[in-house]
Amino acid sequence: MRSGIIAKKVGMTRLFMEDGKQIPVTVLQLDNLQVVAQRTTEKDGYTAVQLGAGTPKIKRVSKAMRGHFAAQKVEPKRKLAEFRVSEDALIEVGAEISAEHFLTGQKVDVSGTSIGKGFAGAMKRHNFGGLRASHGVSISHRSHGSTGQCQDPGRVFKGKKMAGHMGAARVTTQNLEVVKTDAERGLVFIKGAVPGPKSGWVTVKDAVKKKAPEGLPFPAAVKSAATEAPVAEAPAEGGEA
């Protein structure tokens, strides 16, 4: 079982395919995504990797977290997330994960915090049909109606669909397709919409309900030192570059 990634939702656009079709996609950016820590069976009782992404203002990082990053010799991160992995899929601390972690055409599960809508009625929140426009209905046209209980059991069951706070909840959209990856810019293009607002953080994992394609980077697609280091231009003859 491989690790997932942390990505920032940049926004939506469209891509034109070779056959002329246009596909709506969500652009996700891997912002300096690194392995911050490992969790091992011997020490923690389970195996996982802790990833970090983004660059925070140092004054917003607590003293405890600064010590955590310093102990691992990793730059402070704005967003942290932990992914359960198998023992053979542990990644070295400090390794930077590339956008090529996923393959084109692969199915993934994307999790994020949905956009908050505030207090919403039953028609908007649960797609209820509402009551009749007339014939005995007064000022209750958009109400949810009866909650379904009488003297026995004499209460409303937990989980009953009613008006309440809508959105701002953890949502996972499954089996979304990876249309394209751009390792140079650290971008992953996902077909369709993903949960959350622009600039929101999401996690992307291999789809649990689909078979993983062959050729997946294992344990992860890690940027090499040669890729990270910029190539210096050779100085011109007889002078500096």
Curated annotation (Swiss-Prot):
Listed A to Z, the keywords are:
Methylation, Ribonucleoprotein, Ribosomal protein, RNA-binding, rRNA-binding
The record lists the organism as Ruegeria pomeroyi (strain ATCC 700808 / DSM 15171 / DSS-3)
* Family statement drawn from the similarity comment of this UniProt entry: Belongs to the universal ribosomal protein uL3 family.
Q: Which residues carry this modification: N5-methylglutamine?
A: Q151
GO CC term, one of those recorded: cytosolic large ribosomal subunit
| Record function comment | One of the primary rRNA binding proteins, it binds directly near the 3'-end of the 23S rRNA, where it nucleates assembly of the 50S subunit.
Q: List the disulfide bonds.
A: none
Q: Which PROSITE patterns match?
A: RIBOSOMAL_L3
How would you describe the post-translational modification of this protein?
A: Methylated by PrmB.
Annotated protein name in UniProt: Large ribosomal subunit protein uL3
A molecular-function term among this protein's GO annotations: structural constituent of ribosome
Residues making up the signal peptide according to the UniProt record: none
Q: What's a single GO BP term from this record?
A: translation
InterPro entries recorded: Ribosomal_uL3, Ribosomal_uL3_bac/org-type, Ribosomal_uL3_CS, Transl_B-barrel_sf
Q: How does it assemble?
A: Part of the 50S ribosomal subunit. Forms a cluster with proteins L14 and L19.
